[in-house]
A protein has these predicted regions:
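Membrane-embedded alpha-helical bundles of multi-pass enzymes
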Residues: 2-198
């Protein structure tokens, strides 16, 4: 039987993993309007815990980049079936690890800028500026990575092909702008939910 501290510890790992999975699913389905805000809400909710940030990023990339598994089999390149399977899974896990690492680093920035004090007691203007800066940092990071061969899909670009309205909005603010907007929405959902719990 699990004791309360073990249950709490499991939740700290389970929810970030679930958030990453929902985010990864959202980039490949028409349910992004439901899944992505929930995913980013979970990201913000656990952003003060470093391992939670890593778990979210790891599972987001693991699911959203699962198409890498379609590289298998690589037998036409001379690899055996087993070697091809190992190589393909290794590539996917490596990309997922990098995704987790990047979100982990972003989480460190969140910890430094945002979590030094209780966000629910901050004045709205300083809070908004800090959250906008953190969201902008993510968007700029995606923009920089998109210029390299090591970046295939992100929060901004992933949803555009499946939604004509987002595609139109992206013409005005770009994929990075969409990324910033989504992260901002995720934060305010987290903030409103947190305030509602405080006042219950």
């Amino acid at each position: 039987m699990l004791i309360p501290t073990q249950v709490k510890s499991l939740k700290q790992y389970f929810y970030p993993c679930l958030g990453g999975i929902l985010g990864g699913i959202s980039v490949a389905t028409h349910f992004w309007l439901i899944f992505m805000p929930i995913s980013l809400f979970i990201l913000w909710k656990g952003s003060e815990r470093r391992i939670a940030n890593f778990c979210w990023g790891f599972f987001f990339i693991l699911i959203s980049h699962s198409w890498l598994y379609d590289l298998h089999p690589l037998t036409w390149l001379g690899f055996s079936w087993l070697a091809s399977l190992i190589i393909t899974i290794s590539i996917l896990l490596f990309c997922a690890f990098l995704g987790g690492l990047l979100v982990y680093l972003w989480g460190l920035l969140v910890e430094i800028i945002l979590w030094k004090e209780d966000v629910f007691k901050m004045k709205i203007l300083p809070l908004t500026l800090k959250v906008f800066f953190l969201s902008l940092t993510w968007g700029i990071g995606e923009l920089i990575l998109s210029q390299t061969p090591f970046f295939w899909i992100g929060l901004g670009e992933s949803l555009v092909p499946g939604d004509i309205y987002l595609a139109g909005l992206a013409r005005w603010i770009g994929a990075s702008g969409l990324c910033v907007l989504q992260i901002l929405i995720g934060f305010w959902i987290f903030y409103i939910q947190g305030l509602s719990l405080i006042h219950i």
